[in-house]
């Protein structure tokens, strides 16, 4: 009977303790008494350090996301400024306003002045795929840069435009590509539209680069549509979720996450890590303590 053996063993230990000399008993009691506060102190230190490491991990993740979002915002600002510059370019204004230009003059103007104005920026920004001007004054398409306004309806982003003269940012995750669009009005009449098409992967590259093992990242627009999402999680319980709200609920419940909102586009950036990866950091810290 194991229980009986344990009882006999405990009786033997108690008997040996009673039979000990007083100084030996006192020594054992002093050792035990000194170990108790040391154990409590070590346990308290471990708990405090674990909390500190978790807090630092969260702070580091938040800092990484802020830097990443700022890097993407910097690109957004560059292309917004480029659109604004082109909007007020005298050559662009002349093309938009001159509706009775003969074919020869139009060809000369398009080929030697306006077309270079819309193609040269590609040499300085590798994220630019193309810049287009859609205008009522343009009767026949010239290359890919100058397009009749009526053909704008064929573009995937056309139906998403609002009646706004500010730069509008839109993302197509299927193509995938990003566009920055600015509409130009004469009173209430739409006369022209400038559009910069950008490389999706190059714009989101800063976020892609910080997604490491057991982490993920996501970008949502103001309507909650997923503009970008990627995970490097071994046991990914998010893989079958396509709705942003479902993903966010799962992330908030099972992951450590941080978020940041773009001041220019209103896009919301998320960076999240598995709790397992955070605990791994705590474990590594404990090993260094030992």
PLM-predicted stretches and their roles:
Residues 222-223, 231-289:
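Extracellular/periplasmic juxtamembrane segments that couple receptor/chemosensory ectodomains to their
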Residues 59-156:
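Extracytoplasmic/periplasmic sensory segments of membrane signal-transduction proteins
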Residues 7-51, 55, 59, 290:
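Extreme N-terminal signal-anchor transmembrane helix of membrane signaling/transducer proteins, especially
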Residues 133, 184, 219-220:
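Hydrophobic beta-strand positions
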């Amino acid at each position: 009977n194991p229980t009986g053996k344990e009882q006999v063993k405990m009786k033997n230990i108690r008997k040996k303790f009673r039979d000990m000399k007083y100084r030996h008993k006192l020594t054992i009691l002093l050792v035990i008494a000194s170990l108790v506060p040391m154990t409590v102190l070590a346990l308290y230190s471990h708990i405090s350090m674990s909390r500190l490491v978790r807090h630092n991990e969260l702070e580091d993740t938040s800092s990484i996301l802020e830097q990443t979002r700022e890097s993407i915002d910097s690109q957004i600002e560059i292309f917004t400024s480029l659109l604004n510059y082109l909007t007020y370019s005298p050559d662009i204004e002349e093309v938009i306003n001159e509706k009775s230009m003969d074919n020869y003059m139009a060809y000369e103007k398009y080929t030697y002045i306006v077309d270079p104005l819309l193609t040269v920026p590609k040499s300085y920004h590798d994220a630019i795929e193309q810049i287009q001007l859609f205008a009522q004054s343009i009767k026949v398409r010239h290359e890919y840069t100058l397009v009749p306004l009526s053909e704008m309806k064929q573009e995937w982003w056309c139906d998403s435009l609002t009646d706004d003269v500010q730069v509008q940012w839109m993302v197509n995750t299927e193509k995938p590509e990003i566009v920055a669009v600015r509409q130009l009005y004469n009173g209430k009449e739409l006369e022209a539209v400038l559009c910069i098409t950008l490389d999706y992967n190059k714009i989101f590259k800063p976020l892609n680069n910080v997604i490491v093992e057991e982490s993920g990242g996501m970008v949502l627009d103001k309507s909650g549509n997923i503009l970008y999402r990627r995970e490097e999680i071994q046991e990914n319980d998010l893989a079958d979720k396509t709705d942003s709200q479902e993903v966010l609920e799962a992330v908030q419940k099972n992951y450590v996450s941080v978020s940041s909102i773009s001041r220019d586009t209103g896009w919301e950036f998320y960076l999240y890590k598995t709790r397992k990866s955070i605990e791994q950091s705590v474990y590594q810290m404990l090993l260094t303590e030992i």
